[in-house]
Amino acid sequence: MTRPNYMIREYPLQQGALEIGYIEEYFSEFPNKKSASEIMQRLDGRDYQILMAEAPLLDDSAVVPVSYKVSHELRAEESDPKLADLVRRLKDTLDFDNQRILYNWLGATRLDWRGRGHFRALTEEQEVWAVTNGYGEIVVKTKNRYYDMRGTLDSLQFNVIKLETSADPLDSKVYLSKRLGPLVLDAHRSRRQVTRV
């Protein structure tokens, strides 16, 4: 039995921002969807990667976007107030001085496509890109309420590095990271076909 071949597109900034703005409409669990202009503003002037997995419908009538990831470099000194706050929160747990940090800002899989390996394929492609571009660690933030995402990150060998509790435990913030290197890439399991748009 051969493993699935995941179709992934890697986008440049403007087109990728539009595509992500479109696919986020499928995610009712996310109250604060990002607009294309927000995405472009955040990523402009920094290293970034925009990935989207696509899959054919059961009747092969069309190919649809099913999962996405948007990541960017996270610098020790950030001028954007939200990113500066993130760095401040993570200074004690991440080594910003001796390695490049990649922040997995946005990412999800459509509910009806979960459990089929698309997010794993995107993560593995992200890790290849990160290692190739000199990153030593990937960090991601989620909320306690997103059990599926936390479980997925656990299966992808991300480690919890910080927990910020909230009055409502579901709103507690969970920070996870994964150190990168050749052994991480050797453990990849997905067969991916990547198209750079």
Model-derived regions: residue spans:
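Conserved acyl-donor/pantetheine-binding loop and adjacent beta-alpha core of acyl/acetyltransferases
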Residues: D59-L106, A167
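C-terminal "cap" of GNAT-fold acetyltransferases
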Residues: T165-V197
